[in-house]
Every structure is written in structure tokens, then in C-alpha cells.
Amino acid sequence: MRRTTRRTTEKASYSHLLPASGDLDELVARVATSRSRTITLMPICLPEDAPSGLWIATGARDYIVYPDDADAQWRSGIVCHEIAHMLLGHDPRPGTSDLGGLVAAAAPSIDPQVAARFLHRHGYADAVEADAENLGTRLAAELGAAHTAAQGHRDRVFDRMR
């Protein structure tokens, strides 16, 4: 990994946002609160050639789109990657391919001019994607570890109650 990428993601302070429970929805709520913007998770049926995740930023609300058939781990990875873009201050930018069908499926109520500001990325070729992938992976890993630890604590409490 490039040194600049590592420095960029290390500057992002996010530990206060990670819930002790390891719950993804709680992380999303905390990020939304910290940014004073509602974040709506939108599972939808995506075409095979669509990106696996998408961040759509509108006036006061953010949408994170992910495949409706994503299992919990894949969903967490996608959502954490898109949240990483938010935490790193990346601006939504127009994509390089036609998103008309995806926009209509994901958020039919969004004005097409607003939709032009989609954050749409394919691959991990640029520094922005590398930074988001690095931080998103760290977020997902720490969230998973917190979830495992919380489950272990609950199991020990229940064992003592028996």
C-alpha cells in the first residue's frame, strides 16, 4: 500500500463511532448522527454488471445501495466501504457508465439531476478507492471483532445464570 494512502486513513478518527455490540446498524446510526445526515440502507436487486455498493448523496440524506442477496458479512463489507468514503470526506462524483437503470431501481424518488452526483466506482484503481477500501476493511474487521466479543460476553453471562 502506498504511504500516502496509509497516512490518509490513519488520520481518520472513527473509533468513537464503533459500537461495542459490533452491530452494523448501530454503526450506521452513529455515523449518521456524527454527520448530521440520515443514512438509509437500500438492499435492491442489482444487475450483474452493477457495482456491488453505491453511495448516493442527496441534499440532507445519504443512501447506501447494496445487493439484496448479500449475506451479513458481504453487506457489512459493502456498507463499511461506503461509510469509509463518508468518513474520509470523499465527494460523490459522477460515474463513468450509464447509471439510469440503477438509479431508477435504487431511488426512483431522487431527481435525475441529483442522481448525477452519485458516488459510483468500479475497481480499486485510484487513491480514493484504495483509501476507502483500507478504512472500510478496518471498520468491518473491528466491527466483526466487537460483535464476536459481545457475543462471548453474553454467552458467559447466560452460563453464569444457569
Predicted features along the sequence, with ranges:
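A general "mature secreted/periplasmic domain" signal
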Residues: 28, 33-45
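A broad, low-amplitude sensor of folded, mature protein cores
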Residues: 1-4, 70-72, 81-83, 154
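Active-site scaffold of zinc-dependent metalloenzymes
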Residues: 40-76, 83-89
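Aromatic-enriched hydrophobic runs in primary sequence
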Residues: 65, 79-82, 124, 161
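Metalloprotease/metallohydrolase-associated module, dominated by Zn2+-dependent proteases
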Residues: 1-33, 92-162
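Amphipathic alpha-helical interface surfaces
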Residues: 27, 75-79, 83, 95
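Generic alpha-helix signal with a bias toward terminal, lower-confidence helices
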Residues: 43, 51-53, 78, 95, ...
